[in-house]
A protein has these predicted regions:
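Charged, low-complexity intrinsically disordered terminal segments
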Residues: 2-560
Length: 560
């Protein structure tokens, strides 16, 4: 059944508010997992389910993802489902073409009588909505017929964000990762200092940006379609029908080669508890459990790329591994600093504390905390959410390494795991078979891009040294495109207290408006510093509201 064209853009139907979450299994246990003896992917614990995919592709940076997304949607016959933190109809999938996303979707819908398009964006609160206005999406919804529907998702605890980023075509092909279809996400792997194609709808340029998506088909795509339909149902009260198992055409983009075929993919979620007590959707923390299990399972190398690194518990789990005499290397790639001043206050301050925790534990010299720079030495925003453990596990999704991604926001991550025991080394195909080779190949591709060297050269250096860090040190360049160490900042007492309070970064809904619950019995000096931090953030929040009133036409930077 097509959606009702008269359905409200912002609000949902009342009967869906109390509907149970049909996807909710038992939530994952809270906190670090013990070192797993078997597979890291365990349905009901570290993932919702595992599903087979005929092909897996990893799309690095916005240009590659947008081209694949455009090609896939061009093949759509029955359905396109878009779920995002931000979806802006004014963006262009190809900056060299005049066609915007709204015109592209409208053209597809009007040319195919059986195609239904559903677009679901987080109902952002003030002041974030000033930078990511809802008006363009509402105009798209009002200007099209009953087969193209755009809605806002507000079915979350107050302050929580809908952070999943999904695109599903005909229930046959799906994308998941860190990239929203928004205006400041496009960039190439070259990350040029000044690329005239990196412009917002108002003509304002934005800086280089690195991100990653995964593309899957088969049962894995159908699992993401089910997740997306459930998200739509919870937000709107409407339940789209699943598509048939067989599709008329293969939407896989012909120009995108798979990195792996015939694989098993784990789908992990984060969903906060929400709803009235009689039909409350339980907390789902599979991505959190997966993060700790992956860290615990590592034998030689943990490679992390992320927008944030603000979780004290994740830092402590990594620190424990660094303290082991024969533990794994840890390579962490982050932005030089968050682009938004609010994120610098809320996320970079606890990041400094977390990084100090790692440095103090690194008695054996197995830690590298790095940031990528352009050919001219300028910063590159790292927005990707990637975990690679040895040749054993690759996770790509929407989850940040902060607290709210563990249990407060909605998240979705995809994971590929090599058969138990096959991916312990870094040599990939030399020891671990096709799955391990693909996992190591993705990691080496990412590191090589950041370092400005050929992927084959990095892979050879890893094989020759037996160490990712040794290979990186060997290939390090004094100038040009490269990875440079993150600056060492020792946080003050006030900054430590601010980090402990986790302002804007709660772990669960009950902590959101009670930051004092996050710090168990701190000493008196820390309490005084915490009070100062609260006064500071209160004054800053008030100033933020005033300043952001002038930002309606400006592009948001770095969030999502």
């Amino acid at each position: 059944m097509p959606d009702d064209p008269a359905a409200p853009f912002r609000t949902r139907l009342p009967e869906a508010r109390s509907a149970p979450n049909r996807l909710a299994d038992d939530p994952a246990p809270h906190g670090p997992a013990p070192r797993p003896a078997g597979p890291v992917l365990r349905p009901g614990v570290t993932c919702w389910r595992t599903a087979r995919t005929g092909r897996v592709a990893v799309l690095v940076d916005g240009a590659e993802y947008f081209a694949a997304a455009r090609a896939a949607m061009e093949q759509a016959r029955r359905s396109i489902l878009l779920v995002g933190w931000d979806i802006d109809p004014r963006m262009r999938l190809d900056p060299d073409r005049a066609e915007t996303l709204d015109r592209f979707l409208t053209r597809l819908m009007r040319s195919r009588p059986t195609l239904h398009v559903r677009v679901l964006k987080w109902d952002m609160p003030f002041p974030i909505v000033l930078e990511h206005p809802h008006d363009p999406l509402e105009r798209l919804d009002r200007s099209t017929g009953r087969r193209l529907n755009a809605r806002l998702d507000s079915e979350l605890p107050v302050g929580a964000a809908q952070h999943q980023k999904l695109l599903v075509v005909d229930d046959a092909l799906a994308f998941c990762g860190g990239i929203d279809l928004s205006f400041d996400r496009w960039d190439t792997a070259a990350h040029r200092d000044h690329d005239p194609r990196r412009r917002c709808p108002n003509g304002e340029p934005y800086g280089p940006r690195h991100d990653v998506m995964m593309m899957v088909d088969g049962d894995a795509a159908r699992a993401l379609a089910e997740l997306g339909r459930e998200r739509w149902r919870r937000a709107t009260g409407e339940a789209p029908e699943p598509g048939p198992a067989a599709t008329e055409a293969d939407p896989w983009p012909a120009e995108v080669p798979p990195v792996l075929t015939d694989a098993i993919v784990g789908v992990s979620r984060t969903m906060p508890p929400f709803g009235p007590p009689s039909s409350r959707n339980p907390a789902i923390r599979e991505s959190e459990a997966l993060t700790f299990a992956a860290i615990a399972a590592a034998k030689r190398t943990i490679y992390l790329e992320n927008q944030y690194f603000a979780s004290a518990r994740i830092a402590e789990a990594l620190a424990r591994r660094l303290a082991e005499p024969d533990g794994p290397e840890v390579v962490l790639v982050l932005s030089m600093e968050s682009p938004s001043w609010f994120d610098r206050m809320a996320m970079d301050t606890p990041r400094a504390v977390a990084l100090r925790c790692l440095r103090m534990a690194d008695r054996h010299g197995r830690l590298r905390t790095m940031t990528p720079v352009t050919e001219g030495g300028g910063p590159i925003i790292v927005h990707s959410k990637v975990i690679v453990v040895d040749g054993r596990l690759l996770r790509i999704g929407s989850s940040n390494l902060n607290n709210r991604s563990m249990g407060y926001d909605t998240e979705c991550d995809l994971t590929i795991e090599a058969p138990d025991g096959d991916g312990d080394g870094d040599e990939g195909g030399a020891r671990g078979g096709d799955v391990s080779a693909a996992i190591v190949g993705v990691r080496d591709r990412l590191v090589a891009e950041h370092m400005g060297v050929a992927c084959g050269r990095l892979a050879a250096a890893v094989r020759g040294t037996g160490s990712l860090i040794a290979a990186m040190d060997r290939l390090q360049k004094p100038a040009g495109r490269r990875l440079v160490p993150l600056p060492v900042d020792d946080p003050s007492l006030t900054e430590q207290a601010f980090a402990a309070l986790r302002i804007a970064d709660p772990d669960r809904p009950e902590e959101a408006w009670a930051p004092w619950r996050r710090v168990p019995s701190p000493p008196r000096s820390t309490l005084r510093a915490a009070g100062a931090a609260l006064l500071t953030v209160g004054a800053a929040a008030g100033l933020w509201g005033l300043v952001r009133r002038s930002a309606l036409s400006r592009a948001g930077r770095g969030r999502g």
